[in-house]
Amino acid sequence: MASYHIETYGCTANRGESREIERRLRDAGHHRVPGPESADVAILNTCTVVETTERRMLRRARELERETADLVVTGCMALAQGDAFREAGVDARVCGWDEVPAAVGNGECPTTTPDTEPVLDGVVGILPIARGCMSDCSYCITKHATGKIDSPPIAENVRKAEALVHAGARELRITGQDTGVYGWEQGERKLAELLDRVCAIPGDFRVRVGMANPKGVHGIRDELAEVFAANEELYDFLHAPVQSGSDAVLGDMRRQHNVDEFREVVDAFDERLDGWTLATDFIVGFPTETEADHEASMALLGEVRPEKVNVTRFSKRPGTDAADMKGLGGTVKKERSRAMTDLKMAIMDEVYGDMVGERREVLVVEPGTGDSVKCRDGAYRQIVVRGAGERGIAPGDFLDVEVTSHETVYAFGEPV
């Protein structure tokens, strides 16, 4: 049997896939070691969303190659840009994640199709409801790795969710490249029905819905918002990445939604949910983005005031149409990124500041630093409780807390 070391980069789906790799390796008798230098094989689960990440993956692969006897590379970069490792002189076996356990066992990467297995990580159950997406964004390399959407039946996903709850999951994380288009390849829009049925599973748990593009959510916005309002199991949290406040830029990105449609999604949730959390993403410095386009994005950010915002500077990804566009200068992108980041931080600071003095029920999700634990309230805002060990507080517990203070992106709470 082999010893292994595994490192994971990227999204929740990647982390879930790494947990499943580890489970299968343990079942096969392999054991994990703390560092690559003592491992028979190192496993690198990669991300490739932007150019800086790609460079980081190649650099880390070279380091691991020197530190361990054998290297297996998996994840999105392995699937979308597998040749990049060979071209960089990295001696590694490149596999889909579902192929890694066999590669560790017999030294070969078989050809299989990755599945969507659920994974339990502490009290968090990670449930990929589909793989792939329906979009064709001009800048995105991830689809080269994940392909077109493939949605398992609702009943199958509900069975997986039930298994996670029965195994001890207190938080279910519904994941996918785009959860909003679940079922679209079958001519149906199934996300709302799936969530309703998952919430009907007996047990005391919470459900977080992963990224759902405005394109998919817009057509079911009222139905989806009603499901959120009707089910207390659902965190009042929606991650809908708008990417730009300019319709012209959205068209060049091939995002398949416009700014008003994004606003209509936000309005539908505003009408039905008090104090819900909107998360979104913006790409700054897209090749065709003018100063006016950037100002439109800033205005939209200030208008909808999302509590979580991912701001990413555009970077060219190989094999995408946007890679052939004449880009903006690095200084321009940096200035626009800084301006948007400053605004988002001001919004978040205000949100968490307004929570001070309020009482909220939270779910303890995972250990924090020292003797603290990380908790989530009903809108998925993070509240840290200190001194958890001496109070007998552990992941999986539900607590009533009073918010006592805050940092920019989280609050502190005391049990009451």
Task: Name each region found by the language model.
Residues 316, 324-416:
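Terminal RNA-binding accessory module
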Residues 203, 221-222, 229, 305-306, ...:
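Conserved N-terminal phosphate-binding loop of PLP-dependent enzymes in the Aspartate aminotransferase
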Residues 120-123, 133-135, 234, 244, ...:
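Short flexible coil/turn linkers enriched for glycine and charged/polar residues
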Residues 11, 43, 76, 129, ...:
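Residue-level signature of catalytic and energy-coupling elements of molecular machines
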Residues 71, 75, 80-81, 166-291:
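Conserved SAM/AdoMet-binding glycine-rich loop
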Residues 29-31, 35-37, 184-193, 369-371, ...:
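Short, glycine- and charge-enriched coil/turn segments that flank and shape catalytic ligand pockets
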Residues 135, 147, 180, 247-248, ...:
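Glycine-centered loop/turn positions within well-structured domains
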Residues 1-182, 190, 234, 259-271, ...:
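Proteins enriched for Cys/Gly/acidic motifs involved in redox and nucleic-acid/cofactor modification
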